[in-house]
UniProtKB/Swiss-Prot annotation:
Naturally occurring in which organism (per UniProt): Arabidopsis thaliana
Localization per Swiss-Prot or TrEMBL: Nucleus
Motif Nuclear localization signal per record, residues: 71-78
GO molecular function: DNA-binding transcription factor activity; zinc ion binding
UniProt name for this protein: Zinc finger protein ZAT18
SMART domains the record matches: ZnF_C2H2
Domain notes: Contains a slightly degenerated ERF-associated amphiphilic repression (EAR) motif, which may be involved in the activity of transcriptional repression.
């Protein structure tokens, strides 16, 4: 069933009316806001936001927030004599393994990499996993090796019990 052209034109009229009403309402709201902002800016725009701790005034809330963060930072009390007698050894970074000294933490980090690699190579010399069953079973001069025609389960049974004790499994498909 098709719509009549008159139904389409009627719905378009409604859409046009709604759009024009929305445009009118937006322009009215914008004018109201502009009036409020212009009156407020003349009276309270300068130094509108005030810090509760030190009573300093700021133009924006963001600036006040950044300033408030500075009140939370701990203040360092430094003795000037300690600064003068500051020893260079205190600024040096010391390797805990070989007691070598470095000027920066980055240099110490690069040096520590040498210790880590030497530890890894020492650990890799000694195998961490010990296998209880040998893959190859040597018996006098003949070698028993894995039979690739058998399943892994059958191979394990052969290695454990020998060929004579393994049950024969027929894997032929029945039609």
């Amino acid at each position: 069933m098709k719509r009549d052209r008159s139904d389409y034109e009627e719905s378009m009229k409604h859409i046009d009316i709604v759009e024009s009403l929305m445009m009118l309402s937006r322009s009215f709201v914008v004018k109201q806001i502009d009036v409020k902002q212009s009156t407020g800016s003349k009276t309270n725009h300068n130094n509108h936001f005030e810090c509760k701790t030190c009573n300093r005034k700021f133009d924006s809330f963001q600036a006040l927030g950044g300033h408030r963060a500075s009140h939370k930072k701990p203040k360092l009390i430094v003795d000037q004599e300690q600064v003068k007698h500051r020893n260079k050894e205190n600024d040096m970074h010391k390797c805990t393994i070989c007691d070598q000294m470095f000027g920066t933490g980055q240099a110490l980090g690069g040096h520590m990499r040498k210790h880590r690699t030497s530890m890894i190579t020492e650990q890799s010399i000694v195998p961490s996993v010990v296998y209880s069953r040998p893959v190859f079973n040597r018996c006098s001069s003949s070698k028993e090796i894995l039979d690739l025609n058998l399943t892994p389960l059958e191979n394990d049974l052969v290695l454990i019990f020998g060929k004579n004790l393994v049950p024969q499994i027929d894997l032929k498909f029945v039609n």
